[in-house]
Amino acid sequence: MTPDPSDCLAPTAFVDFDHPAVAGYARESAGGPGTDRERAVRLYYAVRDGIRYDPYLIDLSTKGLRASTVLENGRGWCVNKAVLLAAVCRAAGIPACMGYADVKNHLSTERLRQTMQTDVFYYHGYTSIFLDGRGVKATPAFNLSLCEKFRLRPLEFDGTEDSIYHPFDL
C-alpha cells in the first residue's frame, strides 16, 4: 500500500525534521535551488556519506530512533539513516516515508552474523521519496568510505530509479 504523498510531509516522533539541527542539515545538504529530484539526490548523498553506517549502535527507544539523534550521533544503522533521509526530504518539502524489507545480507562480517545469529536482516530500512508523481526507493545505509574499505560497489541514487539493494561486490 502506497501512502498518500501529502501524508508524508508532517513531522513525527521519529521524523523530527522540525528539530533545528535536522532543519539546518537539510538546508545545507539540499544545496539551494533545483528540482525536487536534484535536491533529493543531494540529500541522499549527504546522509549516505555524511552519517557513518554502524550496525552495532541499535537503540530502539523513541529517542534513539529520532532523526535528530542520528544526526547528533553522526552514525547509525539502516533504519536510522533511512529515518534521517525521510526527515531531511520532508524538511525540504519533498514527501518521503519509511519502507521496510527483510534482506539476506551477503555483505555482513562474521562478527555481525554472530551478534545477530543470522545473516537475514529483518526490518531493513529504506526511504521512499515521492518524485515526479511516484515513490522512488533509496537506501542510504552504507557510506562511501565503508564501501571502499570492504570493496563494495556503493549504491548510487539518481532520483528516477530505485536504489535499494547492493550488488555482491566489485
Q: Positions of the model-derived regions?
A:
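Active-site neighborhood of thiol-dependent amide/isopeptide-bond enzymes
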Residues: 55-123
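His-Asp-centered catalytic microenvironments across diverse enzyme cores
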Residues: 2-5, 9-17, 103-170
